[in-house]
Amino acid sequence: MQQLAGDPTRIPLPGEPWDLESQAVAVRNVHRAELKALHDAASVGGQARLPIDYKLDFEKFESFDNHIRGAFMLLQLEAGVAAYQGDPAKCRAAQKTAVGLYLAIQGQPDLTGFLGANSQLSRLSSTLERLLPYSQWTESELSKLQQQLCSIDYRQQLKLAIAGECVTEVASYEQFYPLTNGSEIEMLRWSLFARQSLDNEWPVVLAQFQSMGAQKTAERKTRFRFSKLPFDVYAPFRNQLAASGAHAAARRSLINAGLAVERFRLRHGRLPATLAEVDTDLLERGQDEAIPLTDPFDGKPLKYLVQPERCLIYSIGDDQLDNGGDVDFDETWANHKGPLDMGFSIRR
């Protein structure tokens, strides 16, 4: 499907050349049964779970992740083809199902599932953003999308995943007993610290995880062979967990704000000059976000830029530095440049 798009991340927009359109349609048609199953499941609701046995079964994890990613890519293809062929109803339906699928994979009781679910939010955000001008959403439909996405509490999700990971890793130490004697205590201590840290706002969570990572890295230098095992698992991987949660919270806030701006345009016939101008009833409040326009990475308001072709809402992102709204990939990939900030744009 990536090859059919002619690019790793994009299906051409209406009016752009697409030599592989017929092949893309053929792929979509071959998978009609799978698409119907996804649409039916999303309309009913429910949860999709990785069959966890709390063992380090990486093949099972990879299989689950591949299936989830494949489902999102298939829906992305369907939405893109529908937009390209001027079928906004089918385009909206595919995006609604993608949101439903994203909700269904929340609450995974392990870190692999948590990280895998978060990775699909970027794909979902990109699809909503790029196809927004071609989907012909109503204000009520956009409001429902906001409500669905804002129903997720990422800090609680991460707490659950950490608890499950604790069970998995404590069990794995049995393979090396007695060389790992005492490692279980270290894992339980870290799990308690991590879950308690998540009672704070995201900027505090990030700082505390970084502090713990630095501490464990220093302690690791005093250990030898297998006795280093409990310290190996803490840093730097453990720091990425909080960053992943904050990344998902930021991405969701950007979608929420972006759809609110589009609803503002539907209501007032123009785009707002600032985010503060957006009617408060257009912004959905999330369970874990007291202020929907706050950047999880620094606790400050999300940034808003009015540019010649778009209005851009952006977060400073993982590096916690404001790079002025650097959210675009290098289209030529000459320098393999990725975006430094995270954004959601609305075409003017």
What positions do the PLM features span?
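Short acidic linear motifs
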Residues: 1-348
